[in-house]
Amino acid sequence: MIIHPKVRGFICTTTHPLGCERNVLEQIAATRARGVRTDGPRKVLVIGASSGYGLASRITAAFGFGADTLGVFFEKPGTASKAGTAGWYNLAAFDKHAKAAGLYSKSINGDAFSDAARAQVIELIKTEMGGQVDLVVYSLASPVRKLPGSGEVKRSALKPIGQTYTATAIDTNKDTIIQASIEPASAQEIEDTVTVMGGQDWELWIDALEGAGVLADGARSVAFSYIGTEITWPIYWHGALGKAKVDLDHTAQRLNARLAKRGGGANVAVLKSVVTQASAAIPVMPLYISMVYKIMKEKGLHEGTIEQLDRLFRERLYREDGQPAQVDDANRLRLDDWELRDDVQGACKALWPQVTTENLFELTDYAGYKHEFLKLFGFERTDVDYDADVETDVKFDCIELA
Protein backbone atom coordinates (compact mmCIF):
# COMPACT_ATOMS: atom_id res chain seq x y z
CA MET A 1 0.00 0.00 0.00
CA ILE A 2 0.97 3.68 -0.23
CA ILE A 3 1.52 5.27 3.19
CA HIS A 4 1.78 8.92 4.19
CA PRO A 5 2.08 10.37 7.71
CA LYS A 6 -1.04 11.10 9.77
CA VAL A 7 -0.34 12.85 13.08
CA ARG A 8 -2.81 12.97 15.95
CA GLY A 9 -1.64 14.70 19.13
CA PHE A 10 1.85 13.43 19.94
CA ILE A 11 1.44 10.19 17.97
CA CYS A 12 1.83 9.49 14.28
CA THR A 13 -0.88 6.93 13.50
CA THR A 14 0.79 5.61 10.34
CA THR A 15 4.21 4.03 9.84
CA HIS A 16 6.38 3.34 6.81
CA PRO A 17 8.12 -0.07 6.84
CA LEU A 18 10.87 0.85 4.37
CA GLY A 19 11.52 4.17 6.11
CA CYS A 20 11.87 2.34 9.43
CA GLU A 21 14.32 -0.10 7.87
CA ARG A 22 16.40 2.75 6.44
CA ASN A 23 16.47 4.40 9.89
CA VAL A 24 17.84 1.19 11.39
CA LEU A 25 20.41 0.82 8.60
CA GLU A 26 21.54 4.40 9.25
CA GLN A 27 22.12 3.56 12.93
CA ILE A 28 23.92 0.33 12.02
CA ALA A 29 26.21 2.23 9.62
CA ALA A 30 26.96 4.88 12.27
CA THR A 31 27.87 2.13 14.73
CA ARG A 32 30.05 0.19 12.29
CA ALA A 33 31.88 3.38 11.32
CA ARG A 34 33.25 3.54 14.86
CA GLY A 35 34.69 0.05 14.56
CA VAL A 36 33.76 -3.32 16.03
CA ARG A 37 35.26 -4.21 19.40
CA THR A 38 35.46 -7.68 20.88
CA ASP A 39 36.18 -6.73 24.50
CA GLY A 40 32.60 -5.92 25.48
CA PRO A 41 29.34 -7.79 25.97
CA ARG A 42 28.82 -11.11 24.18
CA LYS A 43 25.23 -12.07 25.08
CA VAL A 44 22.78 -9.24 25.62
CA LEU A 45 19.15 -9.04 26.74
CA VAL A 46 17.34 -5.78 25.92
CA ILE A 47 14.00 -5.28 27.69
CA GLY A 48 12.14 -2.61 25.72
CA ALA A 49 14.09 -3.11 22.50
CA SER A 50 11.94 -1.69 19.72
CA SER A 51 12.57 2.05 19.58
CA GLY A 52 14.52 4.95 21.06
CA TYR A 53 17.32 4.12 23.46
CA GLY A 54 16.40 0.42 23.72
CA LEU A 55 16.74 -0.07 19.96
CA ALA A 56 20.00 1.91 19.95
CA SER A 57 21.31 -0.35 22.75
CA ARG A 58 20.59 -3.45 20.73
CA ILE A 59 22.20 -2.01 17.59
CA THR A 60 25.29 -0.92 19.55
CA ALA A 61 25.68 -4.31 21.24
CA ALA A 62 25.29 -6.23 17.98
CA PHE A 63 27.09 -4.07 15.46
CA GLY A 64 29.56 -2.31 17.77
CA PHE A 65 30.59 -5.39 19.77
CA GLY A 66 29.42 -8.41 17.76
CA ALA A 67 27.07 -9.52 20.54
CA ASP A 68 24.21 -11.99 20.29
CA THR A 69 21.00 -10.21 21.29
CA LEU A 70 17.55 -11.07 22.59
CA GLY A 71 14.93 -8.30 22.58
CA VAL A 72 11.61 -8.04 24.41
CA PHE A 73 8.98 -5.46 23.43
CA PHE A 74 5.28 -4.86 22.88
CA GLU A 75 4.44 -3.88 19.30
CA LYS A 76 1.71 -4.46 16.74
CA PRO A 77 2.66 -6.49 13.65
CA GLY A 78 1.50 -5.30 10.25
CA THR A 79 -1.00 -7.17 8.10
CA ALA A 80 -1.55 -7.12 4.35
CA SER A 81 -4.15 -4.36 4.78
CA LYS A 82 -2.78 -2.34 7.72
CA ALA A 83 0.66 -1.15 8.75
CA GLY A 84 2.01 -2.24 12.12
CA THR A 85 3.79 -0.02 14.65
CA ALA A 86 7.19 1.50 13.93
CA GLY A 87 8.86 -0.68 16.56
CA TRP A 88 7.75 -3.82 14.72
CA TYR A 89 9.43 -2.69 11.50
CA ASN A 90 12.50 -1.43 13.38
CA LEU A 91 13.10 -4.87 14.82
CA ALA A 92 12.23 -6.71 11.62
CA ALA A 93 15.00 -4.65 9.99
CA PHE A 94 17.38 -5.23 12.89
CA ASP A 95 16.77 -8.98 12.79
CA LYS A 96 17.31 -9.17 9.03
CA HIS A 97 20.62 -7.30 9.12
CA ALA A 98 21.91 -8.93 12.31
CA LYS A 99 21.33 -12.37 10.80
CA ALA A 100 22.98 -11.26 7.54
CA ALA A 101 26.02 -10.31 9.64
CA GLY A 102 26.08 -13.79 11.20
CA LEU A 103 24.80 -12.65 14.60
CA TYR A 104 22.22 -14.41 16.78
CA SER A 105 19.03 -12.36 16.99
CA LYS A 106 15.74 -13.38 18.57
CA SER A 107 12.75 -11.31 19.63
CA ILE A 108 9.75 -11.72 21.93
CA ASN A 109 6.64 -9.63 21.33
CA GLY A 110 4.46 -9.39 24.42
CA ASP A 111 4.00 -7.70 27.77
CA ALA A 112 7.54 -7.22 29.13
CA PHE A 113 6.05 -6.67 32.62
CA SER A 114 4.68 -10.23 32.66
CA ASP A 115 6.06 -13.38 34.26
CA ALA A 116 5.37 -15.14 30.95
CA ALA A 117 7.89 -12.88 29.21
CA ARG A 118 10.50 -13.63 31.87
CA ALA A 119 9.91 -17.39 31.58
CA GLN A 120 10.23 -17.26 27.78
CA VAL A 121 13.44 -15.21 27.98
CA ILE A 122 15.00 -17.62 30.47
CA GLU A 123 14.12 -20.59 28.27
CA LEU A 124 15.70 -18.96 25.20
CA ILE A 125 18.87 -18.00 27.09
CA LYS A 126 19.21 -21.61 28.26
CA THR A 127 18.43 -23.28 24.94
CA GLU A 128 19.79 -20.85 22.34
CA MET A 129 22.24 -18.38 23.92
CA GLY A 130 24.70 -20.68 25.64
CA GLY A 131 22.98 -20.52 29.01
CA GLN A 132 23.89 -17.04 30.24
CA VAL A 133 23.77 -13.34 29.37
CA ASP A 134 26.40 -10.79 30.43
CA LEU A 135 24.43 -7.57 29.89
CA VAL A 136 20.80 -6.73 30.67
CA VAL A 137 19.53 -3.41 29.34
CA TYR A 138 16.27 -2.20 30.89
CA SER A 139 14.59 0.36 28.64
CA LEU A 140 10.84 0.17 29.19
CA ALA A 141 8.85 3.37 28.78
CA SER A 142 5.21 2.43 29.15
CA PRO A 143 2.30 4.47 30.47
CA VAL A 144 0.60 1.30 31.77
CA ARG A 145 1.73 -1.73 33.76
CA LYS A 146 -0.30 -4.86 34.45
CA LEU A 147 0.98 -6.27 37.73
CA PRO A 148 2.06 -9.92 37.56
CA GLY A 149 0.00 -12.12 39.84
CA SER A 150 -2.95 -9.84 40.60
CA GLY A 151 -3.42 -8.58 37.04
CA GLU A 152 -4.16 -5.12 38.43
CA VAL A 153 -3.49 -2.33 35.92
CA LYS A 154 -1.55 0.77 37.03
CA ARG A 155 -1.14 3.97 35.01
CA SER A 156 1.61 6.56 35.18
CA ALA A 157 0.89 10.31 35.32
CA LEU A 158 3.00 13.01 33.68
CA LYS A 159 2.09 15.58 36.30
CA PRO A 160 3.77 18.00 38.71
CA ILE A 161 3.58 17.57 42.49
CA GLY A 162 2.02 20.06 44.90
CA GLN A 163 0.79 22.78 42.59
CA THR A 164 -0.47 23.40 39.08
CA TYR A 165 2.40 23.84 36.64
CA THR A 166 2.00 26.48 33.93
CA ALA A 167 4.68 26.94 31.29
CA THR A 168 5.33 27.94 27.72
CA ALA A 169 4.92 24.97 25.39
CA ILE A 170 4.35 24.11 21.74
CA ASP A 171 0.98 22.97 20.43
CA THR A 172 2.60 20.52 18.01
CA ASN A 173 -0.62 20.13 16.01
CA LYS A 174 -0.83 23.85 15.20
CA ASP A 175 2.87 24.81 15.50
CA THR A 176 1.97 27.58 17.93
CA ILE A 177 3.35 28.69 21.29
CA ILE A 178 0.82 28.26 24.09
CA GLN A 179 0.66 28.42 27.87
CA ALA A 180 0.10 24.87 29.07
CA SER A 181 -1.23 24.18 32.57
CA ILE A 182 -1.07 20.77 34.21
CA GLU A 183 -2.87 19.95 37.44
CA PRO A 184 -0.79 18.31 40.19
CA ALA A 185 -0.78 14.55 40.68
CA SER A 186 -2.76 13.01 43.52
CA ALA A 187 -0.99 10.81 46.08
CA GLN A 188 -2.42 7.75 44.31
CA GLU A 189 -1.18 8.94 40.91
CA ILE A 190 2.31 9.47 42.33
CA GLU A 191 2.31 5.99 43.86
CA ASP A 192 1.06 4.43 40.61
CA THR A 193 3.68 6.29 38.55
CA VAL A 194 6.41 4.84 40.77
CA THR A 195 4.88 1.37 40.32
CA VAL A 196 4.85 1.72 36.52
CA MET A 197 8.04 3.69 35.85
CA GLY A 198 10.19 2.97 38.92
CA GLY A 199 12.61 0.12 39.51
CA GLN A 200 10.25 -2.61 40.70
CA ASP A 201 9.99 -4.42 37.38
CA TRP A 202 13.73 -4.10 36.66
CA GLU A 203 14.37 -5.81 40.00
CA LEU A 204 11.83 -8.56 39.18
CA TRP A 205 13.74 -9.22 35.95
CA ILE A 206 17.10 -9.47 37.72
CA ASP A 207 15.52 -11.67 40.44
CA ALA A 208 14.16 -14.04 37.79
CA LEU A 209 17.36 -14.16 35.72
CA GLU A 210 19.59 -14.64 38.76
CA GLY A 211 17.24 -17.24 40.24
CA ALA A 212 17.36 -19.23 37.00
CA GLY A 213 21.15 -19.07 36.89
CA VAL A 214 21.24 -17.30 33.52
CA LEU A 215 23.25 -14.24 34.61
CA ALA A 216 26.95 -14.73 33.89
CA ASP A 217 29.65 -13.89 36.44
CA GLY A 218 30.56 -10.24 35.89
CA ALA A 219 27.15 -9.52 34.32
CA ARG A 220 26.11 -5.88 34.20
CA SER A 221 22.72 -4.25 34.02
CA VAL A 222 21.79 -0.72 33.06
CA ALA A 223 18.48 1.17 33.15
CA PHE A 224 17.83 4.54 31.55
CA SER A 225 16.80 7.79 33.17
CA TYR A 226 16.58 11.50 32.50
CA ILE A 227 17.14 14.26 35.03
CA GLY A 228 17.12 17.40 32.91
CA THR A 229 17.43 20.93 34.23
CA GLU A 230 15.36 23.47 36.12
CA ILE A 231 13.51 24.25 32.86
CA THR A 232 11.92 20.78 32.87
CA TRP A 233 12.17 19.89 36.58
CA PRO A 234 8.59 20.87 37.59
CA ILE A 235 7.06 18.38 35.16
CA TYR A 236 9.85 15.82 35.24
CA TRP A 237 12.39 15.46 38.07
CA HIS A 238 10.26 17.25 40.67
CA GLY A 239 7.06 15.67 39.33
CA ALA A 240 5.52 12.20 39.63
CA LEU A 241 7.92 10.85 37.00
CA GLY A 242 10.88 12.10 39.02
CA LYS A 243 9.70 10.10 42.04
CA ALA A 244 9.73 7.01 39.82
CA LYS A 245 13.25 7.80 38.64
CA VAL A 246 14.42 8.21 42.27
CA ASP A 247 12.98 4.74 42.91
CA LEU A 248 14.98 3.54 39.89
CA ASP A 249 18.14 5.01 41.49
CA HIS A 250 17.46 3.17 44.76
CA THR A 251 16.84 -0.04 42.84
CA ALA A 252 20.14 0.37 40.98
CA GLN A 253 22.00 0.67 44.27
CA ARG A 254 20.44 -2.57 45.57
CA LEU A 255 21.08 -4.43 42.32
CA ASN A 256 24.63 -3.10 42.11
CA ALA A 257 25.43 -4.48 45.57
CA ARG A 258 24.08 -7.88 44.48
CA LEU A 259 25.80 -8.08 41.11
CA ALA A 260 29.10 -6.71 42.47
CA LYS A 261 29.47 -9.88 44.57
CA ARG A 262 30.05 -11.72 41.29
CA GLY A 263 32.21 -9.05 39.67
CA GLY A 264 29.37 -7.27 37.88
CA GLY A 265 27.31 -4.20 38.58
CA ALA A 266 24.14 -2.23 37.93
CA ASN A 267 23.81 1.44 37.08
CA VAL A 268 21.27 3.98 36.01
CA ALA A 269 22.48 5.76 32.87
CA VAL A 270 21.24 9.34 32.71
CA LEU A 271 20.81 10.22 29.04
CA LYS A 272 20.24 13.46 27.17
CA SER A 273 16.90 14.66 25.85
CA VAL A 274 16.16 13.29 22.39
CA VAL A 275 13.13 13.06 20.13
CA THR A 276 11.43 9.75 20.93
CA GLN A 277 7.81 8.62 21.15
CA ALA A 278 8.24 8.78 24.93
CA SER A 279 9.59 12.34 25.14
CA ALA A 280 7.01 13.68 22.67
CA ALA A 281 4.31 12.86 25.23
CA ILE A 282 5.85 15.01 27.98
CA PRO A 283 4.56 18.60 28.06
CA VAL A 284 7.28 21.26 27.60
CA MET A 285 9.76 18.70 26.19
CA PRO A 286 9.13 19.46 22.49
CA LEU A 287 9.95 23.15 23.05
CA TYR A 288 12.93 22.41 25.28
CA ILE A 289 14.30 19.84 22.79
CA SER A 290 13.79 22.27 19.89
CA MET A 291 15.90 24.84 21.76
CA VAL A 292 18.61 22.54 23.07
CA TYR A 293 19.02 20.85 19.66
CA LYS A 294 19.67 24.22 18.01
CA ILE A 295 22.17 25.26 20.67
CA MET A 296 24.00 21.92 20.77
CA LYS A 297 24.14 21.70 16.96
CA GLU A 298 25.67 25.18 16.82
CA LYS A 299 28.29 24.10 19.38
CA GLY A 300 29.04 20.81 17.62
CA LEU A 301 27.73 18.84 20.62
CA HIS A 302 24.56 17.31 19.15
CA GLU A 303 23.92 13.59 19.67
CA GLY A 304 20.98 11.37 18.77
CA THR A 305 20.07 8.06 20.40
CA ILE A 306 22.73 6.01 18.61
CA GLU A 307 25.54 8.46 19.43
CA GLN A 308 24.49 8.48 23.08
CA LEU A 309 24.43 4.69 23.32
CA ASP A 310 27.71 4.37 21.48
CA ARG A 311 29.31 6.68 24.05
CA LEU A 312 27.64 4.78 26.91
CA PHE A 313 29.06 1.46 25.72
CA ARG A 314 32.50 2.56 24.50
CA GLU A 315 33.39 5.26 27.03
CA ARG A 316 31.47 4.20 30.14
CA LEU A 317 30.39 0.56 30.43
CA TYR A 318 33.21 -1.00 28.37
CA ARG A 319 36.18 1.34 28.43
CA GLU A 320 39.10 0.27 26.24
CA ASP A 321 41.55 0.99 29.07
CA GLY A 322 39.65 -1.46 31.28
CA GLN A 323 39.09 1.15 33.96
CA PRO A 324 35.76 1.34 35.82
CA ALA A 325 33.26 3.81 34.43
CA GLN A 326 33.17 7.34 35.75
CA VAL A 327 30.01 7.78 37.86
CA ASP A 328 28.37 10.61 39.79
CA ASP A 329 27.83 10.62 43.56
CA ALA A 330 24.75 8.40 43.15
CA ASN A 331 26.69 5.81 41.05
CA ARG A 332 24.95 6.95 37.86
CA LEU A 333 26.56 6.99 34.42
CA ARG A 334 26.11 10.53 33.12
CA LEU A 335 25.63 10.89 29.37
CA ASP A 336 23.74 14.16 29.80
CA ASP A 337 27.06 15.88 30.56
CA TRP A 338 27.23 17.85 27.31
CA GLU A 339 23.60 18.96 27.50
CA LEU A 340 24.08 20.18 31.08
CA ARG A 341 27.12 22.31 30.28
CA ASP A 342 26.71 25.83 31.66
CA ASP A 343 27.04 27.45 28.23
CA VAL A 344 24.31 25.20 26.76
CA GLN A 345 21.87 25.69 29.62
CA GLY A 346 22.61 29.42 29.87
CA ALA A 347 21.70 29.80 26.19
CA CYS A 348 18.49 27.79 26.76
CA LYS A 349 17.41 29.98 29.68
CA ALA A 350 18.10 33.15 27.69
CA LEU A 351 16.13 31.84 24.70
CA TRP A 352 13.10 30.47 26.57
CA PRO A 353 11.25 33.80 27.22
CA GLN A 354 11.95 35.08 23.69
CA VAL A 355 10.16 32.34 21.77
CA THR A 356 6.81 33.21 20.17
CA THR A 357 4.63 31.56 17.53
CA GLU A 358 6.04 33.99 14.97
CA ASN A 359 9.73 33.27 15.63
CA LEU A 360 9.46 29.61 16.72
CA PHE A 361 11.07 28.21 13.56
CA GLU A 362 13.71 30.94 13.47
CA LEU A 363 14.90 30.91 17.11
CA THR A 364 14.70 27.15 17.72
CA ASP A 365 15.27 23.94 15.80
CA TYR A 366 11.56 23.12 15.84
CA ALA A 367 11.82 22.22 12.15
CA GLY A 368 14.47 19.67 13.15
CA TYR A 369 12.23 18.42 15.97
CA LYS A 370 9.30 17.87 13.58
CA HIS A 371 11.59 16.13 11.10
CA GLU A 372 13.02 13.81 13.78
CA PHE A 373 9.54 13.08 15.12
CA LEU A 374 8.17 11.98 11.72
CA LYS A 375 11.38 10.06 11.06
CA LEU A 376 10.63 7.90 14.13
CA PHE A 377 7.73 6.48 12.12
CA GLY A 378 9.71 6.02 8.90
CA PHE A 379 8.81 9.30 7.20
CA GLU A 380 10.73 12.33 5.88
CA ARG A 381 13.63 10.31 4.48
CA THR A 382 15.08 11.50 1.18
CA ASP A 383 15.97 7.92 0.17
CA VAL A 384 12.37 6.63 0.28
CA ASP A 385 9.70 7.15 -2.38
CA TYR A 386 6.55 7.69 -0.32
CA ASP A 387 4.30 7.46 -3.38
CA ALA A 388 5.45 3.91 -4.11
CA ASP A 389 3.75 0.75 -2.88
CA VAL A 390 5.29 -0.81 0.21
CA GLU A 391 4.81 -4.25 1.81
CA THR A 392 3.25 -3.96 5.29
CA ASP A 393 2.99 -7.64 6.24
CA VAL A 394 6.59 -8.12 7.41
CA LYS A 395 7.52 -11.28 9.31
CA PHE A 396 10.71 -12.02 11.26
CA ASP A 397 12.17 -14.33 13.90
CA CYS A 398 9.84 -13.28 16.71
CA ILE A 399 7.94 -15.25 19.33
CA GLU A 400 4.45 -13.89 19.95
CA LEU A 401 3.33 -14.22 23.56
CA ALA A 402 -0.38 -14.96 23.86
From Swiss-Prot:
A biological process from GO: fatty acid biosynthetic process
Positions of substrate binding: Y226
GO molecular function (one): NAD binding
Protein EC: 1.3.1.9
Pathway(s) per entry: Lipid metabolism; fatty acid biosynthesis
InterPro entries in the record: Eno_Rdtase_FAD-bd_dom, Enoyl-CoA_Rdtase_cat_dom, FabV-like_NADH_b, Trans-2-enoyl-CoA_reductase
Binding residue positions for NAD(+): 48-53, 74-75, 111-112, 140-141, 245, 274-276
Keywords: Fatty acid biosynthesis, Fatty acid metabolism, Lipid biosynthesis, Lipid metabolism, NAD, Oxidoreductase
Site (Plays an important role in discriminating NADH against NADPH): E75
EC top class, as a word: oxidoreductase
A Pfam family of this chain: Enoyl_reductase
Catalytic residues of the enzyme: Y236
Chemical reaction(s) catalysed: a 2,3-saturated acyl-[ACP] + NAD(+) = a (2E)-enoyl-[ACP] + NADH + H(+)
Cross-referenced HAMAP family: FabV_reductase
Subunit structure, as described in the record: Monomer.
Family: Belongs to the TER reductase family.
Its biological purpose: Involved in the final reduction of the elongation cycle of fatty acid synthesis (FAS II). Catalyzes the reduction of a carbon-carbon double bond in an enoyl moiety that is covalently linked to an acyl carrier protein (ACP).
Name of this chain's protein: Enoyl-[acyl-carrier-protein] reductase [NADH]
Taxonomic classification: Bacteria, Pseudomonadati, Pseudomonadota, Gammaproteobacteria, Lysobacterales
